[in-house]
Swiss-Prot record:
GO CC aspect terms: bacterial nucleoid; cytosol
Subunit structure: Homodimer.
Gene3D superfamilies: Nucleoid-associated protein YbaB-like domain
SUPFAM superfamilies for this protein: YbaB-like
An MF annotation (GO) of this entry: DNA binding
Protein name listed in UniProt: Nucleoid-associated protein SACE_0254
Family listed: Belongs to the YbaB/EbfC family.
Source organism, top-level taxon: Bacteria
InterPro entries attached to this UniProt entry: YbaB-like_sf (IPR036894), YbaB/EbfC (IPR004401)
Keyword annotations of the record: Cytoplasm, DNA-binding
Length: 116
């Protein structure tokens, strides 16, 4: 802080650069991570990246009933949703510390600027 309670611009820039690097690292970790979700007691499993991109769907042959494709469709949707929920939790885990430093994701309050 400079006299008068104003933050030092150099400190603000250093903190912003550090947070940017943390954000980039977290985004890279999310892109490389994979999480899975399942439905029907594991009959259908979906794998998504940490950023939510669908990677694969595995269907146990026991789940395939040619006379009841609606149930299989429901299981696939449920498995993908479960995997996406897991990806969102991972995103919160990885990005939470970074967005928390930004004032809980509400602007630039974490930079120490008055009034923010």
């Amino acid at each position: 802080m400079q006299p008068g309670g104003q933050p030092n611009m150099q400190q603000i820039m250093e903190q912003a650069q550090k947070m940017q690097q943390q954000l980039m690292t977290a985004q890279q970790e999310l892109a490389e991570a994979e999480v899975s979700g399942s439905a029907g007691g594991g009959l259908v499993t979906a794998v998504v990246s940490g950023s939510g991109e669908l990677k694969s769907v595995a269907i146990d042959p026991k789940a395939v009933d040619p006379d009841d494709t609606d149930t299989l469709s429901d299981l696939v949707v449920a498995a993908v949703r479960d995997a996406n929920r897991a990806a969102q939790e991972l995103q919160q885990e990885k990005m939470g510390p970074v967005t928390g430093a930004l004032g809980g994701g509400q602007g630039l309050g974490g930079l120490g600027l008055p009034g923010l």
